[in-house]
């Protein structure tokens, strides 16, 4: 029986797994096709890809800054420079933006490269049996661990492990904000020296020019377009039913804002993140080795 079951291979799960693996046996389970969680990377063709979730990391605390700088020394991350335009003209301190060397999911890949990870493995039930956990997977298999660490979004964590959580944890009510993202490939468009644009708009909040991350060279322009909180909240539960409709709305709005013509799009894909991030800081109280 292994010591730790980690649910989720995002940055949080990967960091925890790497640290625990120094002195314990660890195994990771993730419902996705690959590592990364919110820092996932979507491949288009060959080495052309989109960071369609987390766009970059900008450390605020000294401890996290040192952690990221160490990853930079190991060539797991690099700096995303050039021009980042803010059309909202908000006053914010200039900060260094770090990205994964081969996609933002490369951060997780690097951290868990020596740890057994199971993808397409959804944890459907957890049960504590005296001194170990029984984990049921989507294929009905059961696996057994001494300790359990859940790094999934809080609403999912709460649903999965409710009866084992303390009242203090159950009463935590983080405001999870959704995000709707469109990935688009443009042909015959100028390669602008702009890395990202923050818009003052009701539909589109932000867009990243993937070419400027210098992971590939292409005549095609790849843009990741992320919508506003208001637009995302309104439409997150209906985009699956009519993806083409919402892709068109967002791409036409992007055309109006930038001049990039929707008719020049040769690939487009929409993705909805139901639990993209927390709106406000929430005091977290939990034991990262056991839930009881």
Predicted regions and their residues:
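Core beta-strand elements of the Rossmann-like FAD/NAD(P) dinucleotide-binding domain
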Residues: 2, 138-147
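Glycine-rich FAD pyrophosphate-binding loop
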Residues: 5-7, 18-45
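N-terminal FAD cofactor-binding segment of flavoenzymes
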Residues: 19, 40-83
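Central helical "cap/lid" subdomain
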Residues: 36, 145-195, 260
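FAD-binding beta-loop-beta segment adjacent to the flavin cofactor pocket
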Residues: 41-43, 213-219, 267-292
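Short beta-strand to alpha-helix junction loop
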Residues: 56-62, 85-110, 238-249
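A conserved short coil-to-beta-strand element within the FAD-binding core of flavoproteins
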Residues: 119-134
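Flavin-binding catalytic cores
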Residues: 190, 213, 217-222, 227-274
